[in-house]
A protein has these predicted regions:
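A generic beta-sheet turn/junction motif
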Residues: 80, 126-128, 340-344, 442-446
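A short, acidic, flexible beta-alpha connecting loop/helix-capping segment that sits on the rim
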Residues: 15-17, 25, 454-460
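Conserved active-site loop/cleft motifs that coordinate metal ions or position small ligands
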Residues: 10-13, 412-414, 441, 448-454
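C-terminal outer-membrane beta-barrel translocator/porin domains of Gram-negative envelope proteins
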Residues: 113, 119-121, 132, 144-156, ...
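Periplasmic polypeptide-binding modules associated with outer-membrane biogenesis and secretion
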Residues: 27-154, 168, 184-201, 242, ...
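A short alpha/beta connector and helix-capping loop motif
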Residues: 427-439
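Gram-negative/organellar outer-membrane beta-barrel architecture
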Residues: 102, 107, 116-295, 301, ...
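Conserved catalytic block of serine-dependent lipid acyl chemistry
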Residues: 1-18, 28-34
Length: 470
Protein backbone atom coordinates (compact mmCIF):
# COMPACT_ATOMS: atom_id res chain seq x y z
CA UNK A 1 0.00 0.00 0.00
CA UNK A 2 0.98 3.65 -0.53
CA UNK A 3 -0.30 5.64 2.43
CA UNK A 4 -1.36 9.28 2.21
CA UNK A 5 -4.29 11.63 1.90
CA UNK A 6 -7.05 11.38 1.04
CA UNK A 7 -7.04 7.59 0.40
CA UNK A 8 -4.69 4.63 0.02
CA UNK A 9 -3.93 3.31 -3.48
CA UNK A 10 -3.25 -0.39 -4.09
CA UNK A 11 -0.82 -1.27 -6.88
CA UNK A 12 -1.32 -4.95 -7.83
CA UNK A 13 0.41 -5.70 -11.15
CA UNK A 14 -0.78 -8.82 -12.98
CA UNK A 15 2.45 -10.84 -13.16
CA UNK A 16 0.95 -13.58 -15.30
CA UNK A 17 3.26 -16.58 -15.44
CA UNK A 18 6.16 -14.76 -13.74
CA UNK A 19 7.11 -16.13 -10.34
CA UNK A 20 9.42 -15.31 -7.46
CA UNK A 21 12.16 -17.52 -8.92
CA UNK A 22 12.35 -15.82 -12.33
CA UNK A 23 15.42 -13.74 -11.48
CA UNK A 24 16.63 -13.57 -15.09
CA UNK A 25 13.34 -11.94 -16.21
CA UNK A 26 13.72 -8.80 -14.11
CA UNK A 27 13.16 -6.50 -17.10
CA UNK A 28 9.70 -8.02 -17.59
CA UNK A 29 8.83 -7.39 -13.93
CA UNK A 30 9.84 -3.73 -14.38
CA UNK A 31 7.75 -3.27 -17.54
CA UNK A 32 4.67 -4.81 -15.92
CA UNK A 33 5.12 -2.64 -12.81
CA UNK A 34 5.50 0.53 -14.88
CA UNK A 35 2.38 -0.25 -16.90
CA UNK A 36 0.38 -0.91 -13.73
CA UNK A 37 1.51 2.38 -12.16
CA UNK A 38 0.82 4.38 -15.33
CA UNK A 39 -2.71 2.99 -15.44
CA UNK A 40 -3.34 4.57 -12.01
CA UNK A 41 -1.58 7.92 -12.55
CA UNK A 42 -4.73 9.86 -11.77
CA UNK A 43 -4.93 8.38 -8.25
CA UNK A 44 -1.17 8.60 -7.69
CA UNK A 45 -0.96 12.32 -8.50
CA UNK A 46 -2.57 13.04 -5.11
CA UNK A 47 0.75 12.03 -3.51
CA UNK A 48 3.02 14.06 -5.81
CA UNK A 49 5.38 16.76 -4.44
CA UNK A 50 5.75 20.18 -6.05
CA UNK A 51 8.63 20.14 -8.59
CA UNK A 52 10.99 22.23 -6.41
CA UNK A 53 10.49 20.02 -3.34
CA UNK A 54 10.96 16.86 -5.41
CA UNK A 55 14.21 18.18 -6.90
CA UNK A 56 15.49 18.99 -3.40
CA UNK A 57 14.55 15.51 -2.20
CA UNK A 58 16.43 13.90 -5.11
CA UNK A 59 19.50 16.06 -4.51
CA UNK A 60 19.59 15.09 -0.83
CA UNK A 61 19.68 11.40 -1.78
CA UNK A 62 22.61 11.66 -4.20
CA UNK A 63 25.74 10.09 -2.79
CA UNK A 64 29.21 10.76 -4.14
CA UNK A 65 30.53 7.81 -6.14
CA UNK A 66 32.86 5.49 -4.29
CA UNK A 67 35.19 2.85 -5.60
CA UNK A 68 34.00 -0.74 -5.14
CA UNK A 69 36.03 -2.52 -2.47
CA UNK A 70 38.65 -4.95 -3.72
CA UNK A 71 38.05 -8.49 -2.47
CA UNK A 72 40.76 -9.89 -0.23
CA UNK A 73 39.29 -13.41 -0.26
CA UNK A 74 36.22 -15.56 -0.86
CA UNK A 75 34.93 -17.62 2.03
CA UNK A 76 32.15 -20.15 2.64
CA UNK A 77 30.17 -20.64 5.84
CA UNK A 78 27.56 -23.20 6.81
CA UNK A 79 28.86 -26.21 4.87
CA UNK A 80 29.10 -29.39 6.93
CA UNK A 81 29.05 -32.35 4.51
CA UNK A 82 29.69 -30.60 1.20
CA UNK A 83 32.92 -29.02 -0.07
CA UNK A 84 31.85 -25.72 -1.68
CA UNK A 85 35.48 -24.84 -2.48
CA UNK A 86 35.11 -27.25 -5.44
CA UNK A 87 33.00 -24.58 -7.16
CA UNK A 88 35.48 -21.70 -6.84
CA UNK A 89 36.70 -21.98 -10.44
CA UNK A 90 33.22 -21.48 -11.92
CA UNK A 91 32.36 -18.43 -9.79
CA UNK A 92 32.64 -15.00 -11.39
CA UNK A 93 33.80 -13.30 -8.18
CA UNK A 94 37.57 -13.46 -7.66
CA UNK A 95 39.94 -12.51 -4.88
CA UNK A 96 41.92 -9.42 -5.90
CA UNK A 97 39.13 -8.05 -8.08
CA UNK A 98 36.64 -5.26 -7.23
CA UNK A 99 33.41 -6.45 -5.64
CA UNK A 100 30.49 -6.67 -8.08
CA UNK A 101 27.09 -7.22 -6.47
CA UNK A 102 25.49 -8.49 -9.69
CA UNK A 103 28.28 -11.03 -10.14
CA UNK A 104 27.86 -12.17 -6.53
CA UNK A 105 24.14 -12.73 -7.15
CA UNK A 106 24.97 -14.86 -10.19
CA UNK A 107 27.41 -16.83 -8.06
CA UNK A 108 24.69 -17.62 -5.51
CA UNK A 109 22.61 -19.09 -8.34
CA UNK A 110 25.53 -21.27 -9.47
CA UNK A 111 26.00 -22.58 -5.94
CA UNK A 112 22.27 -23.23 -5.56
CA UNK A 113 22.27 -25.09 -8.90
CA UNK A 114 24.72 -27.65 -7.47
CA UNK A 115 21.70 -29.17 -5.72
CA UNK A 116 23.19 -29.37 -2.23
CA UNK A 117 21.89 -26.13 -0.70
CA UNK A 118 18.42 -24.95 0.25
CA UNK A 119 19.62 -21.36 0.79
CA UNK A 120 22.60 -19.34 -0.49
CA UNK A 121 23.24 -15.73 0.61
CA UNK A 122 26.30 -13.46 0.50
CA UNK A 123 27.72 -10.54 2.43
CA UNK A 124 30.83 -8.38 2.56
CA UNK A 125 32.78 -8.77 5.79
CA UNK A 126 35.81 -6.65 6.79
CA UNK A 127 38.97 -8.43 7.91
CA UNK A 128 42.59 -7.49 8.65
CA UNK A 129 43.49 -8.33 5.04
CA UNK A 130 40.56 -6.37 3.58
CA UNK A 131 36.95 -7.04 2.59
CA UNK A 132 36.00 -10.70 2.21
CA UNK A 133 33.06 -11.99 0.19
CA UNK A 134 31.32 -14.55 2.39
CA UNK A 135 28.80 -17.01 0.97
CA UNK A 136 26.41 -18.18 3.68
CA UNK A 137 25.18 -21.69 2.82
CA UNK A 138 22.44 -23.83 4.28
CA UNK A 139 22.68 -27.46 3.25
CA UNK A 140 19.49 -29.31 2.45
CA UNK A 141 18.39 -31.06 5.65
CA UNK A 142 17.44 -34.22 3.75
CA UNK A 143 20.90 -34.57 2.16
CA UNK A 144 23.30 -36.10 1.37
CA UNK A 145 20.86 -38.86 0.37
CA UNK A 146 18.38 -37.75 -2.27
CA UNK A 147 15.35 -39.85 -3.25
CA UNK A 148 12.99 -39.28 -6.17
CA UNK A 149 9.88 -41.12 -7.31
CA UNK A 150 8.43 -41.05 -10.81
CA UNK A 151 5.63 -42.82 -12.61
CA UNK A 152 5.08 -43.89 -16.21
CA UNK A 153 1.55 -44.90 -17.16
CA UNK A 154 0.14 -45.36 -20.64
CA UNK A 155 -3.02 -46.86 -22.08
CA UNK A 156 -4.89 -46.57 -25.36
CA UNK A 157 -8.39 -47.37 -26.53
CA UNK A 158 -7.34 -50.89 -27.60
CA UNK A 159 -6.55 -51.77 -23.99
CA UNK A 160 -2.79 -51.93 -24.54
CA UNK A 161 -0.74 -50.09 -21.97
CA UNK A 162 1.94 -50.26 -19.38
CA UNK A 163 2.79 -49.17 -15.87
CA UNK A 164 6.22 -48.41 -14.46
CA UNK A 165 7.29 -47.00 -11.10
CA UNK A 166 10.68 -45.26 -11.19
CA UNK A 167 12.83 -44.81 -8.07
CA UNK A 168 16.17 -43.03 -7.90
CA UNK A 169 18.65 -42.60 -5.06
CA UNK A 170 21.73 -40.36 -5.13
CA UNK A 171 24.29 -40.27 -2.33
CA UNK A 172 26.43 -37.12 -2.58
CA UNK A 173 29.84 -36.31 -1.04
CA UNK A 174 31.20 -39.77 -0.36
CA UNK A 175 34.63 -38.12 -0.18
CA UNK A 176 36.11 -34.62 -0.31
CA UNK A 177 36.31 -34.69 -4.13
CA UNK A 178 32.53 -35.06 -4.38
CA UNK A 179 32.12 -38.75 -5.26
CA UNK A 180 28.53 -39.89 -5.79
CA UNK A 181 26.68 -43.21 -5.72
CA UNK A 182 23.76 -43.12 -8.18
CA UNK A 183 21.03 -45.77 -8.21
CA UNK A 184 17.88 -46.22 -10.26
CA UNK A 185 15.17 -48.88 -10.13
CA UNK A 186 12.19 -49.37 -12.41
CA UNK A 187 9.31 -51.65 -11.43
CA UNK A 188 6.68 -52.62 -13.98
CA UNK A 189 6.48 -53.74 -17.58
CA UNK A 190 10.21 -53.37 -18.28
CA UNK A 191 12.01 -53.74 -14.92
CA UNK A 192 15.48 -52.25 -14.63
CA UNK A 193 18.24 -51.84 -12.04
CA UNK A 194 21.09 -49.37 -12.53
CA UNK A 195 23.97 -48.38 -10.25
CA UNK A 196 26.95 -46.08 -10.83
CA UNK A 197 29.89 -44.88 -8.77
CA UNK A 198 30.95 -41.44 -10.00
CA UNK A 199 34.37 -40.15 -8.89
CA UNK A 200 35.63 -36.64 -9.77
CA UNK A 201 39.40 -36.55 -10.30
CA UNK A 202 40.00 -32.90 -9.43
CA UNK A 203 39.48 -30.80 -6.32
CA UNK A 204 38.04 -27.95 -8.43
CA UNK A 205 35.00 -28.24 -10.66
CA UNK A 206 35.46 -26.42 -13.97
CA UNK A 207 39.26 -26.29 -13.82
CA UNK A 208 41.35 -27.04 -16.91
CA UNK A 209 42.28 -30.47 -15.53
CA UNK A 210 38.78 -31.33 -14.32
CA UNK A 211 37.65 -34.88 -15.08
CA UNK A 212 35.93 -37.92 -13.63
CA UNK A 213 35.82 -41.70 -13.70
CA UNK A 214 32.65 -43.75 -13.45
CA UNK A 215 31.96 -47.47 -13.20
CA UNK A 216 28.38 -48.61 -13.72
CA UNK A 217 26.18 -51.63 -14.28
CA UNK A 218 22.64 -52.20 -15.51
CA UNK A 219 20.29 -55.21 -15.38
CA UNK A 220 17.18 -54.98 -17.56
CA UNK A 221 14.32 -57.11 -18.81
CA UNK A 222 12.37 -55.80 -21.79
CA UNK A 223 9.23 -57.14 -23.41
CA UNK A 224 9.01 -56.85 -27.18
CA UNK A 225 6.01 -57.62 -29.35
CA UNK A 226 6.12 -58.39 -33.06
CA UNK A 227 3.36 -57.28 -35.44
CA UNK A 228 2.40 -58.13 -39.01
CA UNK A 229 1.97 -55.34 -41.62
CA UNK A 230 -1.75 -55.08 -40.72
CA UNK A 231 -0.90 -54.27 -37.09
CA UNK A 232 -1.93 -57.62 -35.59
CA UNK A 233 0.31 -59.01 -32.88
CA UNK A 234 2.16 -62.16 -33.93
CA UNK A 235 4.64 -62.82 -31.11
CA UNK A 236 5.71 -61.76 -27.64
CA UNK A 237 9.42 -61.95 -26.82
CA UNK A 238 11.51 -61.15 -23.76
CA UNK A 239 15.04 -59.78 -23.82
CA UNK A 240 17.21 -59.95 -20.70
CA UNK A 241 20.44 -57.97 -20.69
CA UNK A 242 23.32 -57.24 -18.33
CA UNK A 243 25.37 -54.18 -19.28
CA UNK A 244 28.38 -52.60 -17.59
CA UNK A 245 30.89 -49.93 -18.39
CA UNK A 246 33.96 -48.03 -17.22
CA UNK A 247 34.01 -44.39 -18.33
CA UNK A 248 36.46 -41.53 -18.19
CA UNK A 249 35.14 -38.09 -19.00
CA UNK A 250 34.94 -34.44 -18.18
CA UNK A 251 32.26 -31.79 -17.85
CA UNK A 252 32.03 -29.34 -20.74
CA UNK A 253 31.41 -26.12 -18.84
CA UNK A 254 27.75 -25.78 -17.90
CA UNK A 255 26.61 -27.49 -21.12
CA UNK A 256 26.94 -31.12 -20.09
CA UNK A 257 29.55 -33.85 -20.21
CA UNK A 258 31.58 -36.13 -22.49
CA UNK A 259 32.42 -39.76 -21.72
CA UNK A 260 34.72 -42.33 -23.34
CA UNK A 261 35.13 -45.83 -21.99
CA UNK A 262 34.76 -49.59 -22.16
CA UNK A 263 31.29 -51.05 -22.65
CA UNK A 264 29.90 -54.60 -22.65
CA UNK A 265 26.40 -56.03 -22.99
CA UNK A 266 25.37 -59.66 -22.52
CA UNK A 267 21.83 -60.47 -23.65
CA UNK A 268 19.50 -63.39 -24.36
CA UNK A 269 16.11 -63.55 -26.10
CA UNK A 270 13.29 -65.90 -25.09
CA UNK A 271 9.88 -66.60 -26.60
CA UNK A 272 6.68 -66.16 -24.63
CA UNK A 273 3.97 -66.49 -27.31
CA UNK A 274 4.37 -66.84 -31.07
CA UNK A 275 2.08 -67.44 -34.05
CA UNK A 276 4.97 -67.32 -36.52
CA UNK A 277 8.11 -69.37 -37.04
CA UNK A 278 11.07 -68.02 -35.08
CA UNK A 279 14.75 -69.08 -35.03
CA UNK A 280 14.56 -71.02 -31.75
CA UNK A 281 18.30 -71.76 -31.61
CA UNK A 282 19.23 -68.13 -32.07
CA UNK A 283 16.66 -66.94 -29.53
CA UNK A 284 18.23 -68.94 -26.73
CA UNK A 285 21.83 -68.12 -27.62
CA UNK A 286 23.78 -65.80 -25.36
CA UNK A 287 24.82 -62.67 -27.26
CA UNK A 288 27.78 -60.50 -26.26
CA UNK A 289 28.72 -57.09 -27.57
CA UNK A 290 31.84 -55.45 -26.22
CA UNK A 291 33.71 -52.41 -27.36
CA UNK A 292 34.47 -48.73 -26.84
CA UNK A 293 31.69 -46.23 -26.21
CA UNK A 294 31.70 -42.44 -26.76
CA UNK A 295 28.84 -40.49 -25.23
CA UNK A 296 28.00 -36.76 -25.35
CA UNK A 297 25.17 -35.30 -23.25
CA UNK A 298 24.37 -31.58 -23.46
CA UNK A 299 21.19 -30.25 -21.84
CA UNK A 300 20.23 -26.58 -21.85
CA UNK A 301 16.43 -26.94 -21.58
CA UNK A 302 14.80 -24.76 -18.95
CA UNK A 303 12.49 -27.58 -17.78
CA UNK A 304 12.29 -31.35 -18.12
CA UNK A 305 8.52 -31.31 -18.78
CA UNK A 306 6.92 -28.85 -21.22
CA UNK A 307 10.14 -26.82 -21.69
CA UNK A 308 9.75 -23.27 -23.01
CA UNK A 309 13.29 -22.48 -24.10
CA UNK A 310 16.65 -24.10 -24.75
CA UNK A 311 18.12 -27.11 -26.50
CA UNK A 312 19.42 -30.61 -25.82
CA UNK A 313 21.81 -32.90 -27.71
CA UNK A 314 22.64 -36.56 -27.01
CA UNK A 315 25.14 -38.60 -29.06
CA UNK A 316 26.25 -42.19 -28.46
CA UNK A 317 28.63 -44.29 -30.54
CA UNK A 318 29.78 -47.87 -29.83
CA UNK A 319 32.33 -49.83 -31.83
CA UNK A 320 33.41 -53.36 -30.97
CA UNK A 321 32.79 -57.06 -31.50
CA UNK A 322 29.55 -59.07 -31.30
CA UNK A 323 28.98 -62.80 -31.03
CA UNK A 324 28.39 -64.28 -34.47
CA UNK A 325 29.54 -61.27 -36.48
CA UNK A 326 32.77 -61.43 -38.46
CA UNK A 327 32.85 -57.67 -38.99
CA UNK A 328 32.95 -55.02 -36.33
CA UNK A 329 29.68 -54.26 -34.57
CA UNK A 330 28.51 -50.67 -34.39
CA UNK A 331 25.79 -48.66 -32.73
CA UNK A 332 25.14 -45.01 -33.51
CA UNK A 333 22.39 -43.08 -31.72
CA UNK A 334 21.57 -39.36 -31.77
CA UNK A 335 18.76 -37.13 -30.56
CA UNK A 336 18.33 -33.36 -30.65
CA UNK A 337 15.72 -30.95 -29.27
CA UNK A 338 15.24 -27.21 -29.83
CA UNK A 339 12.55 -25.21 -28.01
CA UNK A 340 11.44 -21.61 -28.54
CA UNK A 341 8.53 -19.65 -27.04
CA UNK A 342 6.58 -16.55 -27.98
CA UNK A 343 4.42 -15.42 -25.09
CA UNK A 344 2.30 -18.39 -23.99
CA UNK A 345 2.98 -20.36 -27.21
CA UNK A 346 5.89 -22.82 -27.54
CA UNK A 347 7.37 -24.68 -30.52
CA UNK A 348 9.28 -27.88 -29.71
CA UNK A 349 11.33 -29.50 -32.52
CA UNK A 350 12.86 -32.94 -32.02
CA UNK A 351 14.82 -35.40 -34.14
CA UNK A 352 16.05 -38.90 -33.29
CA UNK A 353 18.11 -41.34 -35.34
CA UNK A 354 19.71 -44.69 -34.52
CA UNK A 355 21.24 -47.68 -36.27
CA UNK A 356 22.98 -50.88 -35.26
CA UNK A 357 24.55 -53.81 -37.03
CA UNK A 358 22.98 -57.07 -35.87
CA UNK A 359 22.58 -60.64 -37.03
CA UNK A 360 19.98 -60.93 -39.76
CA UNK A 361 18.00 -63.76 -38.15
CA UNK A 362 17.49 -61.99 -34.81
CA UNK A 363 13.77 -61.07 -34.75
CA UNK A 364 12.71 -57.47 -34.55
CA UNK A 365 15.50 -55.22 -33.39
CA UNK A 366 16.52 -52.99 -30.49
CA UNK A 367 14.67 -49.89 -31.75
CA UNK A 368 10.90 -49.46 -31.74
CA UNK A 369 8.31 -46.88 -32.74
CA UNK A 370 4.61 -46.68 -32.01
CA UNK A 371 2.57 -44.98 -29.32
CA UNK A 372 1.97 -41.42 -28.20
CA UNK A 373 4.23 -38.99 -30.10
CA UNK A 374 6.25 -41.98 -31.35
CA UNK A 375 4.08 -42.21 -34.51
CA UNK A 376 0.81 -41.58 -32.71
CA UNK A 377 -2.04 -43.83 -33.80
CA UNK A 378 0.12 -46.96 -33.97
CA UNK A 379 0.13 -49.46 -31.13
CA UNK A 380 2.94 -49.19 -28.61
CA UNK A 381 6.21 -50.54 -30.10
CA UNK A 382 4.34 -51.71 -33.21
CA UNK A 383 7.38 -51.14 -35.46
CA UNK A 384 10.78 -52.64 -34.60
CA UNK A 385 14.08 -52.85 -36.40
CA UNK A 386 17.81 -52.18 -36.47
CA UNK A 387 17.56 -48.56 -37.67
CA UNK A 388 15.22 -45.74 -36.67
CA UNK A 389 14.42 -42.19 -37.74
CA UNK A 390 11.83 -39.96 -36.07
CA UNK A 391 11.11 -36.26 -36.70
CA UNK A 392 8.59 -34.45 -34.50
CA UNK A 393 7.27 -30.90 -34.23
CA UNK A 394 5.05 -30.05 -31.26
CA UNK A 395 3.29 -26.80 -30.47
CA UNK A 396 1.62 -26.14 -27.13
CA UNK A 397 0.00 -23.24 -25.34
CA UNK A 398 -0.05 -22.56 -21.62
CA UNK A 399 -3.72 -22.32 -20.62
CA UNK A 400 -3.57 -20.90 -17.11
CA UNK A 401 -1.52 -18.11 -15.57
CA UNK A 402 -2.31 -19.40 -12.07
CA UNK A 403 -2.57 -23.21 -12.29
CA UNK A 404 -4.30 -25.26 -9.61
CA UNK A 405 -2.87 -28.61 -8.41
CA UNK A 406 -0.21 -28.54 -11.18
CA UNK A 407 2.64 -26.35 -12.42
CA UNK A 408 0.67 -25.61 -15.58
CA UNK A 409 -2.00 -26.76 -18.02
CA UNK A 410 -1.24 -26.98 -21.74
CA UNK A 411 -3.09 -27.65 -24.99
CA UNK A 412 -1.15 -28.67 -28.05
CA UNK A 413 -0.64 -30.74 -31.17
CA UNK A 414 2.18 -32.68 -32.79
CA UNK A 415 3.20 -33.63 -36.32
CA UNK A 416 5.41 -36.73 -36.63
CA UNK A 417 7.27 -38.54 -39.40
CA UNK A 418 9.36 -41.66 -38.94
CA UNK A 419 10.00 -45.32 -39.59
CA UNK A 420 12.19 -48.26 -38.62
CA UNK A 421 14.14 -50.62 -40.88
CA UNK A 422 15.44 -54.15 -40.33
CA UNK A 423 18.34 -53.41 -42.70
CA UNK A 424 20.35 -50.47 -41.26
CA UNK A 425 21.57 -49.38 -44.69
CA UNK A 426 18.04 -48.48 -45.77
CA UNK A 427 17.58 -45.69 -43.22
CA UNK A 428 16.67 -42.38 -44.86
CA UNK A 429 13.94 -39.85 -45.56
CA UNK A 430 12.29 -42.13 -48.13
CA UNK A 431 9.47 -44.31 -46.88
CA UNK A 432 8.68 -42.28 -43.76
CA UNK A 433 5.26 -42.77 -42.18
CA UNK A 434 3.39 -39.68 -40.98
CA UNK A 435 1.29 -39.23 -37.86
CA UNK A 436 0.01 -36.58 -35.50
CA UNK A 437 -1.78 -35.93 -32.24
CA UNK A 438 -3.77 -33.33 -30.33
CA UNK A 439 -3.46 -33.29 -26.57
CA UNK A 440 -4.31 -31.68 -23.26
CA UNK A 441 -1.40 -31.80 -20.83
CA UNK A 442 -0.57 -30.98 -17.22
CA UNK A 443 2.83 -30.57 -15.56
CA UNK A 444 2.38 -32.55 -12.33
CA UNK A 445 4.73 -33.35 -9.48
CA UNK A 446 5.20 -36.94 -10.69
CA UNK A 447 5.64 -36.10 -14.36
CA UNK A 448 3.77 -34.72 -17.37
CA UNK A 449 0.22 -36.01 -17.86
CA UNK A 450 -1.41 -36.19 -21.31
CA UNK A 451 -4.89 -36.97 -22.63
CA UNK A 452 -4.49 -37.27 -26.39
CA UNK A 453 -5.94 -38.36 -29.72
CA UNK A 454 -3.52 -39.84 -32.26
CA UNK A 455 -3.78 -40.72 -35.95
CA UNK A 456 -1.34 -42.32 -38.41
CA UNK A 457 -1.26 -42.16 -42.21
CA UNK A 458 -1.88 -45.90 -42.54
CA UNK A 459 -5.25 -45.59 -40.81
CA UNK A 460 -4.21 -46.19 -37.20
CA UNK A 461 -6.22 -44.31 -34.57
CA UNK A 462 -5.79 -44.24 -30.81
CA UNK A 463 -6.85 -42.43 -27.64
CA UNK A 464 -4.10 -42.08 -25.03
CA UNK A 465 -3.86 -41.45 -21.32
CA UNK A 466 -0.13 -41.00 -20.79
CA UNK A 467 1.81 -40.14 -17.65
CA UNK A 468 5.53 -39.62 -18.28
CA UNK A 469 7.70 -38.24 -21.06
CA UNK A 470 6.93 -39.51 -24.58
Amino acid sequence: FISGEPVDVLLAPNLGELGSGDFERGAEFIRIGEASAEAQLKELRAFALPPAEYAAWRAARVRPPTDAPRLAALRFEGAVLSEPHRWLDILGSRAGQPFNAEEAVRDTRKLAASGDYSRVDFRLEPSLAGDELVFDLEEKPWGPNYLRIGLDLSTDDSGAGGFQLRLSHNRHWLNRLGAEWRNQATIGRNPRLFSEFYQPLSESFGSSHDGFAAVWGELQRREQRLFDPAGSETAQLTRKALTWGLDFGRPWGRLGELRLGLWQETARWSKRISEIELPEARLGQLQRLRGVRLRVDFDQLDAASFPRDGWRLNLTGISGRQTGLADRAERLEASATHVKSWGLATLNLQARAARTRAQADVPGGPYTLGGFQQLSGLRTDQLSGNALLLLRASAYWRLSQHPVLTRGWFAGASLEAGNVWLEPGRIGLHGLRSAGSVFLGADTGIGPLYLALGAESGGGRAVYLFLGRP
